[in-house]
Amino acid sequence: MDINEEAYAIQEEVVEFRRALHRCPEIAFHETMTMEYIREHLEEWEISYKIFDPSGIIAVVGNGKKETIALRADMDALEVQEETGLDFASLNHGCMHACGHDGHTAILLATAKILKKHESELDRRVYLVFQPAEETAEGARFMLKTGVLDSVKRIYGVHIFNGIPSGKISLEACLLYTSDAADE
């Protein structure tokens, strides 16, 4: 089975990850339930991780000799009242995952699970960064100040976007989907 087949095989699990996260959105630097959800899965899959206070998790898979890379997902929600009526709608009044961070976190969790399964095949260390407070630049600054990412040569992020057909990706060498950091 190749990686694509493995990803499709756990698609329903990823949907459940997203829906569970969507039900319990949390604002910047208060992502405690989200972090607990992530931590439980990392422990279940025997993936090592470090928790940063007040919020943020970096998990590690692989130990190869090539340069270390990082994969990043954002965890925070917006202070918006959800009125979708979905059976997995937000249970936190006045707080909602309105721009896909629940999906981003679910995707990174699935990636962690698959990478762990193939850990012996990896030629490098991969950091899985679950970043708080993405809606401002503060979350990125906080994660960088930990020093854990100092050895990372490249960081890859993901952002759900309706303008790209399903099954396709867009790679851009510029700032995208940023609100505060565009002028830095």
Regions found by a protein language model. Give the residues of each.
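Histidine/acidic-residue-rich, glycine-tolerant segments that coordinate divalent metal ions
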Residues: L78-V80, L86-M96, G103, S120-S179
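Acidic/His- and Gly-rich active-site-bordering loop/insert found
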Residues: D2-H97, A106-L109, K113-L122
